[in-house]
Amino acid sequence: MAASTSTSSLSVVGTNLSLPPHRHHRHFHSPSSISTRIRTNRLFLSSSLAFSSPRDARVVHAGLGLRRNTPDVWKHYSSVLSQPTAPVPVRQSCTSCCLASAKKRRSNLPRFVPGAFFDSSSFGLSKDKLRHASVKRVQLPHATVGPDEPHAASTTWQEGVAEKQDLSLFDSELERLEGFLGSELPSHPKLHRGQLKNGIRYLILPNKVPPTRFEAHMEVHVGSIDEEDDEQGIAHMIEHVAFLGSKKREKLLGTGARSNAYTDFHHTVFHIHSPTSTKDSDDLLPSVLDALNEITFHPNFLASRIEKERRAILSELQMMNTIEYRVDCQLLQHLHSENKLSKRFPIGLEEQIKKWDADKIRKFHERWYFPANATLYIVGDIGNIPKTVNQIEAVFGQTGVDNEKGSVATSSAFGAMASFLVPKLSVGLGGNSIERPTNTTDQSKVFKKERHAVRPPVKHTWSLPGSSANLKPPQIFQHELLQNFSINMFCKIPVNKVQTYRDLRIVLMKRIFLSALHFRINTRYKSSNPPFTSVELDHSDSGREGCTVTTLTITAEPKNWQNAIRVAVHEVRRLKEFGVTQGELTRYLDALLRDSEHLAAMIDNVSSVDNLDFIMESDALGHKVMDQSQGHESLIAVAGTVTLDEVNSVGAQVLEFIADFGKLSAPLPAAIVACVPKKVHIEGAGETEFKISSTEITDAMKAGLDEPIEPEPELEVPKELVQSSTLQELKNQRKPAFIPVSPEIEAKKLHDEETGITRLRLANGIPVNYKISKSETQSGVMRLIVGGGRAAEGSDSRGSVIVGVRTLSEGGRVGNFSREQVELFCVNNQINCSLESTEEFISLEFRFTLRNNGMRAAFQLLHMVLEHSVWSDDALDRARQVYLSYYRSIPKSLERSTAHKLMVAMLDGDERFTEPTPSSLENLTLQSVKDAVMNQFVGNNMEVSIVGDFTEEEIESCILDYLGTAQATGNFKNQQQIIPPTFRLSPSSLQSQEVFLNDTDERACAYIAGPAPNRWGFTADGNDLLETIDNASSVNNNGTKSDALQTEGAPRRSLRSHPLFFGITMGLLSEIINSRLFTTVRDSLGLTYDVSFELNLFDRLKLGWYVVSVTSTPSKVHKAVDACKNVLRGLHSNGITVRELDRAKRTLLMRHEAEIKSNAYWLGLLAHLQSSSVPRKDLSCIKDLTSLYEAATIEDTCLAYEQLKVDEDSLYSCIGVSGAQAAQDIAAPVEEEEAGEGYPGVLPMGRGLSTMTRPTT
């Protein structure tokens, strides 16, 4: 179960100033997942306006952001067609509790850092502008505001504190401006709010993405903050017992519904994602509501279920007790030391969890689970609002009525309590509001039980100016599992509810200011040895914590920590004192407006779950909820009133707790917390004790603030990377043209009407696939895939490809343009680009807007990377240092060191699948890494795919101009020279290993892995299984459905002869095994909280593997491993059932249907369509996908299972245990270590992120 953190970063109530939630599809990667795809903290060409939260910033950064893939220890692309999309969980899962970020979901909409800046924009407060703004405001549709949510976070300053405003205007203009800015923002026109007589509130929002599905979430306003001293963790326990004990919820699983739950400080949420109807056209909403009613208000606290969940939670507690979790706890403990938030973490206390009986748990439920303390959200393809309201009343109307006592009369419909009990309900889409009548006999009823007026019910100590005597000294958390230095400086203030245009204007000005700071700091990656790894400033509202927190987070190598602090605070002070320049104001204001315009155009593409999350968080914070169009119009209305002086004044207030540190006028930091290692590696001396004191930290801050400062110079931003005259010369010289797509076909253009896919090939050998899609308005994505990847590294050049890709990204330059100029070009043109390396491929992916020639700008950038990339020694030094840090951090991670030891054993020590060692890194030169990367960029080894809302003429013009003029001709010869990876010969003494890690706390994990074929049926020992199976099928034709895929028109190829046979059947098998592992190892035996099965099916390399990841306790981990092995092998004796196969099909087909309108998903479908190294990928792999799933039989799935090597001689396992028993240290030698996901030892950005617990399924 996973907890949710509701941090809304500069959340602007639907205005799109806040980053849209990035959907993780409720798929949480546990530590055991060990997916080592790294999203680096050091971004390449990253222009960012995303300051909601540093962790959001990575989703949105424009520029060539390096999304680097290290050797993926387990997981390759999850899709059957190799698209790197986040998978949707296949079964219900209960995600509960701990300090996790509410950013757990993000929108899957393409999100750009907004771009081109209007030089003609004026920011003066002219009468025309004010009048124009007023018109914009009154044209916006309004709906009912709904009840005044009493659970919104407190926004009250302590007495005597007031906001300062200084506007130099004539009185008449000021009066007009004040009148406009003081008016309320509009409300979402389609959002319907209401309340039943028993107090349950409901919100209904029609939304057709995805079609024929809806989200139903029941939010109970109780969390860990409401627990007494002897109840720590009981809210989470109830969530587990109520959710997993519901029989009605279980019955929904056969309909294709998914369910989940989570617990946080301030609330517990149960949610169901469901089809709108069954196959028999029965309405599913009543059944879903009935299940939520049972879960929330009528759970069975059976002793057997309580014991099951007690074991699961204790396992979860150990599993999530990573060093990241412990760091997050430290941050929250110091940030909120004055209230219960510092000591009520949702996971609870082990000694208390072991003790509670059913009576104790039931009493907490009775105290807090009552109708007036719950809110129901329904968002989805709901057509009939009155019918939905009636269904809600039918299911929940009588709940709790008989149990409530006492009444207090209220006669005024305008009183606070009347507003609470008798909200308005908007029934028209145009926003006309009416009162929904309620039973008059119940209008006077007030309930004995009422939710807290403020959620969470805690009192904060705000960051106010004060004497240095009240300054808390920096706190230091030191631990042997930490690798790098990090420090967080916090400022805590009340939430400013965004209700008026003035509130929105302030948020806009903050975003502009912080955008400038982020860009400036990112430009400091110039020296060979930069003093910091990352510097992030986060200014965000938190509904879960009931406050707004500004956080400066600095991470660095331990040896550089003092310089890192000096640089960061110096830059903060410089921005605070001099402010942003006029050019920066113009650039970032216009960028934000363009981003807002883009999201407004995407209003019909926002998923139901993203809309629901946004509404829930906005209500918790007291923000006005608007739709994307309203938000954009409101933003336009206030943008014309923004001035440079005001932006700098508002921004300075955000930064003064750091910039004026030590002065009486400065707000006192809420906390300063440094998290540091106990020992560090020093060249020539080995491991040495790391010493640091609070005084040294304070001195470093003061030293940085005392350094002289200079104003920021204006940068010249290129309008084009390829001049028109240069382009014309290239076209004259190289004569770009299309040639026949293949030698067998004379046609130069192949268009498939059914899929809309067009295939082309350029004269320089580059194949191109494109698809015109209107699903994402004025948006496009493009991916260049280059074959080879790390597999092409020679035995004398290990690490050359992965370090080379990193070197290219570190430099960030093309042609004669500096890194800063390229970054700003990306901002101006709303380009987001990532560079990635895997075992098989190098890829560049671009997201762009079609507005203002954004696609042409993206193609210009791609052209420059191909033709004029710049390689520098200092960039290589930085890349080498990054991987050296990765390597040294492995022994400090239980999961990564355990996984690494297994991988080394299974793949016979092949370093291409692990991090490069220090000796390999030392051998690399700039020329060797450049050659390793760029030698793969030749025409017949590349493929470009584009999907977007463009025309045929637009896309083909860009293809010819910028790809056709690239000197990509040549043949990639390395394919024959690549040494194919192999599995270690078995049996081997390394097939069963253990790792022990010194730690203060006990934890355990294990991995089980073995060989599998690749996606197309090839194996490491040279067999072509597809050919074998197809021959057997033709000889032994028994008439099963798999032998002929009947569709409209002529029958298509049989499944067993189809190239995707293994892609389809292995996907189904994965779902089935995952379900069995959960049912057996987790639910029946109680040996783990988290267990999963994943397949890594390569496309180019002729092998694959599976891995089972399991977490447990040291006392149970061996039994858990044995149980997992039994499940893996049990499919022989306990065959697959029709019900299991049907559920797996439904899950995968639902995932396909949910993603099919996404540009990014189509980009994955197009991958390798013309790749010479993936010859079996053809159009049928896309066109037949649905029918292939439907046609698969149990026999087909069993054939796939036979190709998984699960026998004792083929299977590898490694068990990792951490604790204080140093004598048991059996960890792998450090020379073999490799790194995992993220900056190892560098803490994840954002409070509470790592403390999210894992799904139960």
Curated annotation (Swiss-Prot):
EC number, as in UniProt: 3.4.24.-
Binding sites annotated in the UniProt record for Zn(2+): 236, 240, 316
A Pfam family that the UniProt record links to this protein: Peptidase_M16
Result for mutant: residue 236 to L: Abolishes endopeptidase activity without affecting transit peptide binding
Location of the transit peptide in the chain: 1-142
Cofactor: Zn(2+)
Active site: 239, 309
Annotated SUPFAM superfamilies: LuxS/MPP-like metallohydrolase
GO BP term (any one): protein processing
Subcellular location per the Swiss-Prot or TrEMBL entry: Plastid, Chloroplast stroma
GO molecular function: metal ion binding; metalloendopeptidase activity
Family label: Belongs to the peptidase M16 family.
Name under which the protein is recorded: Stromal processing peptidase, chloroplastic
Gene: SPP
